[in-house]
Amino acid sequence: IAGMSWESSAHYYRLLNEGIRDRLGGFHSAKCLMYSVDFAEVETLQRENRWVEAAEMMVDAARRLERGGADCIILCTNTMHKLADSIERSVRIPFLHIADPTAERIITEGLDTIALLGTRFTMEEDFYRGRLEDKYDLKVLIPEKAERDLIHHVIYDELCLGQIREASRD
């Protein structure tokens, strides 16, 4: 399931194919099915705390991919992993949770304390941070509220719209 904004989806698709090309060489590219949603609909559901409807949307996407012949489901967005359990229960093929390879890389790098940046949902709720802490015994730090609000704003009002402002990098 693609990133929620097409901006992130395009980036992930490029990285996936560059990785395949680098590994296999030549003209190789990823064999993949991608289901993209209308982020305006997703953002409305998130903002209005309509997570049951958001789960239905993600479950529908996962089932469509499964029917299309996908071998597994990857959800290319941190925030929507709030709905990971619903997605995983809805399909027979494996669902690969984004926090697992993230944690494995963190551990490989010899780290045990990390800072988590993301949307307000990702930073403040337990669905992502809790998995890192409980399953991988990592200490996860999040910014203070004012910083979380700023990061959330930058993600939604800039990055999801394809804007990368120099001032926001600081």
What are these regions (language model features)?
Residues 1-170:
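Non-catalytic structural scaffold of enzyme domains
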